[in-house]
């Protein structure tokens, strides 16, 4: 006759005895904290205590645990699990519980902690993505809300507003370093005018009919200034999706204004123009040479016409700027190659080590553009595609958008890093950062060569505790791994696995071992399919 509740009743009695201090024959010290417990329970739930009490049982009344790896709250939680069979993290960090469970070789708890950390990382990534999508959409809606909130089309408001402003703009010189950028729209513009064709329009080209983008840009740029101050992220303005550089319907006509290379329709006016100031570094020669106003469409960046007959001088300045930028790209490419050659490997993985991959990716994109930029220097009328953030030029709008995406990935990487006031475990030798002190301590042994775990029987030292546990079985001659078919026992789990493949492979069609079964010191369950389960009947 079996009593199903007997095991539960036994655990309850042992837990009550531990709280009362009755028959507790062991004291565990974690820093200044003391924990009274029963040796039998500790040795049954932890391989660390099993090996500890196996050697000189009568002299092992007090156990000292490394407080740098095992914290008192984490051990209290694991001790409660040993006596009650329940694991409640409460407000305790999962990383601390994982470090303590790994130190004590409680592999079931290690598996649960790793799964919980994986779920937490996935949930944080999903929430971050949703927040970015929501903020991007809200900023775009806010930039267009004033034009459509009055119940009439945005074009009607733009037609009335800025005829007078455009007259003042045409008479006064524009600010150097400004750039026109079109917000994402459902239509694809068609680049039909070139700098040479823009010159043929002459001084009258500055006059544009009412309702053109040039007459509406001043009002909309002022309206969008407030939303740009609130949203400091540039990815709310730029369209990073790779679109075809050719497009436009048959009903579109070429605009007479040389500043804009696409026609004006009510639909296209909804993708309004926003003026973005390109911040220039005063100490950069490239930024001083490549000055002026540029208009960025989906097709690229074009140079505005010159009403003073100085177009040839601007072309010469542009060529000089391209040459200077080409030399800078070559130096950056050479430096990145030297860094990759000198970079050494390390087995430990840096938790926050994603930035180096992004920098190498950006350097690879720029170095691959060297032949294209060289060919652009030889063509006097070649269109240039300039980045509004760093003033770098590219041979096509597609590569420009890929380059822009690297800027935003760098911004996201900075946001992902912890704040400066957070004390992050950092290696003092190589500067790597880690999630908890346990992983930092393990990493520091790779630099110092320290082997703190010593076998009491033969004196051999090991870098990690699990290697000592595996070695200790050799001296005890214990064989914890048993075959369920022939009852032969083995010291190491690998020997058992090879034995099953050699002698029992014909009897068992397929065999799947539970995860971590090969790492545990006790006999684990084997999951068999229907054909193999017949052996038990």
Curated annotation (Swiss-Prot):
Keyword vocabulary terms for this entry: DNA-binding, Metal-binding, Nucleus, Repeat, Repressor, Transcription, Transcription regulation, Zinc, Zinc-finger
Annotated ranges, domain BTB: 24-91
Record has rRNA-binding as a keyword: no
Coiled-coil segments on the chain, per record: none
InterPro entries in the record: BTB/POZ_dom (IPR000210), SKP1/BTB/POZ_sf (IPR011333), Znf_C2H2_sf (IPR036236), Znf_C2H2_type (IPR013087)
Subcellular location: Nucleus
Biased amino acid composition, Low complexity: 182-195, 208-229
A GO CC annotation given for this chain: nucleus
Residue stretches of biased makeup (Basic and acidic residues): 122-143
UniProt record similarity statement: Belongs to the krueppel C2H2-type zinc-finger protein family. ZBTB18 subfamily.
Function description: Transcriptional repressor that plays a role in various developmental processes. Specifically binds the consensus DNA sequence 5'-[AC]ACATCTG[GT][AC]-3' which contains the E box core, and acts by recruiting chromatin remodeling multiprotein complexes.
Annotated protein name in UniProt: Zinc finger and BTB domain-containing protein 18
Native source organism of the sequence: Danio rerio (Zebrafish)
